[in-house]
Amino acid sequence: MSETTYTTTEDTDDTNSTDSMVGTTTGETDEYVREEWREYSFDVPTKLGVDDLDVYYGDDQALEGVSMEIPEKSVTALIGPSGCGKSTFLRCLNRMNDRVSSARIDGSVTLDSQEIYQDGVNLVELRKRVGMVFQSPNPFPKSIRENIAYGPEKHGDIDTGVLARLLGRSDEEQREELVERCLRDAALWDEVHDRLDDNALGLSGGQQQRLCIARCLSVDPEVILMDEPASALDPIATAKIEDLIAELSKEYTVVIVTHNMQQAARISEQTAVFLTGGELVEYGDTDQVFENPQSERVEDYITGKFG
């Protein structure tokens, strides 16, 4: 991949297995040995590619030399202690860091082998293809129906042209089909189908988060980024979100940040471990990372010796 420098301007089955990580000693970092890791190859196509990614906020470096390939239609978990760069990395994947005026990004991020940081990239289209669900549910203060239909209507994705008229499908019919499909895909339809005109802010926290996922699905993304989507939810609501993520990964590429290592072990095919200093220390098959980590630092983190 070609390297770019970008400064922001806006305010398991075998199909998912990876090679084992190989570390080499390059010097000591505090009491630990820093490991270098090599890229993994997957048996499924790569959806997102990251090469030598550095991120700075002013003079502070948040990510250092991150390289990884994220396979399509799977769940990739990002774990590590607070402040290690997980969310910064996630936000690089659809250029949400553009909104941070002090951010500077060096390196390469590709979507289907196309560089997303090159000049001329349409950010609206990019963020439709790579959607994001945030830590705290953020439904619009509108009806449940309007929350789903807002994006497609704003971007003209509901067909109002000749073909729709020839097929005898009105705008309202298309809208209702979209709303039902997205709510079903987000496992929410059965709970809200008889109150679609109610204000979304009246839903429970777990329902609001699933509505936000449905809203993300309404613009037909290819990748769904999730930043701690269940951290504010109770165990029952969390279980529903985890079940939903498993279903979504059959059709979408899911990348999730979580502080909950048990959650990462339950729902992901591959896991990336970030540690202090914005360093990606280990990345590979989830079972191997948790059961037989190649890095002593990762083993110490997973077993609770630090972090």
From Swiss-Prot:
It comes from the Archaea. SMART domains: AAA. It catalyses: phosphate(out) + ATP + H2O = ADP + 2 phosphate(in) + H(+). It is a peripheral membrane protein. One of its GO terms (biological process) is phosphate ion transmembrane transport. ATP binds at G80, P81, S82, G83, C84, G85, K86, S87. GO terms for cellular component: plasma membrane. Keywords: ATP-binding, Cell membrane, Membrane, Nucleotide-binding, Phosphate transport, Translocase, Transport. GO terms for molecular function: ATP binding; ATP hydrolysis activity; ATPase-coupled phosphate ion transmembrane transporter activity. The keyword Lipid biosynthesis does not apply. Residues 1-30 are annotated as: Disordered. It is an enzyme of class 7 (translocase). Belongs to the ABC transporter superfamily. Phosphate importer (TC 3.A.1.7) family. Part of the ABC transporter complex PstSACB involved in phosphate import. Responsible for energy coupling to the transport system. PANTHER family: ABC TRANSPORTER I FAMILY MEMBER 17. The complex is composed of two ATP-binding proteins (PstB), two transmembrane proteins (PstC and PstA) and a solute-binding protein (PstS). NCBIfam families: 3a0107s01c2 (TIGR00972). This is Phosphate import ATP-binding protein PstB.
